């Protein structure tokens, strides 16, 4: 069955939260997401004004998705790729690249002028983004702090 790429509704996204659980359990992430945390993450994304959600569907079932959130900066109206996840059995088949392209096309139509994301800076994930014409920032890095 062919993969269909289209916008995803909030309900479809919430019903597909298990994609996050499955995708992030595998290397290189090794993250143990609960389904409740995944649902909460999808809820956060889809209730953000101007959230752009695209998905890959195998028949009626989503096999992957990408979420973009608006982020205006000195460069102008941009979109932040907040999540992209593919079911493990569908990874490394071009679906992620197609989702990124679809998200970029939709963002361009909506008037966005740049796209950015945060991810690992080395390894297969970095190679994946570079193969999709993303470049690492020479100016920025990610800082975090645990709140206790």
Language model regions located:
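A conserved beta-turn-beta hairpin within the catalytic core of GNAT-like acetyltransferases
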Residues: 71-81, 91, 137-139
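Conserved GNAT-fold acetyl-CoA-binding loop/helix
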Residues: 10, 21-43
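A short helix-loop-beta-strand connector motif used in the catalytic cores of GNAT acetyltransferases and
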Residues: 43-55
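A short beta-loop-alpha structural element at the N-terminal edge
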Residues: 2-18
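Conserved beta-strand in the GNAT
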Residues: 55, 61-70, 80, 85
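Conserved active-site alpha-helix within GNAT-family acetyltransferase domains
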Residues: 97, 109, 121-139, 145
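Conserved acetyl-CoA-binding loop-helix of GNAT-fold acetyltransferases
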Residues: 86, 92-105, 131
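Conserved GNAT acetyl-CoA-binding A-motif
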Residues: 100, 107-120
């Amino acid at each position: 069955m062919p993969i269909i790429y289209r916008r995803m509704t909030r309900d479809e996204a919430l019903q597909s939260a298990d994609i996050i659980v499955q995708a992030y359990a595998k290397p290189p992430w090794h993250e143990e997401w609960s389904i409740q945390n995944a649902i909460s993450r999808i809820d956060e994304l889809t209730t953000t004004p101007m959230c752009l959600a695209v998905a890959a569907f195998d028949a009626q079932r989503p096999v992957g998705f990408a979420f973009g959130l608006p982020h205006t900066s000195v460069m102008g109206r941009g979109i932040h790729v907040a999540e992209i996840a593919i079911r493990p059995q569908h990874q490394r088949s071009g679906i992620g690249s197609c989702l990124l392209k679809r998200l970029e096309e939709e963002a361009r139509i909506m008037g966005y002028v740049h796209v950015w994301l945060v991810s690992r800076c080395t390894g297969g994930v970095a190679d994946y983004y570079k193969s999709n014409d993303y470049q690492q920032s020479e100016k920025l890095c990610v800082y975090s702090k645990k709140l206790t």
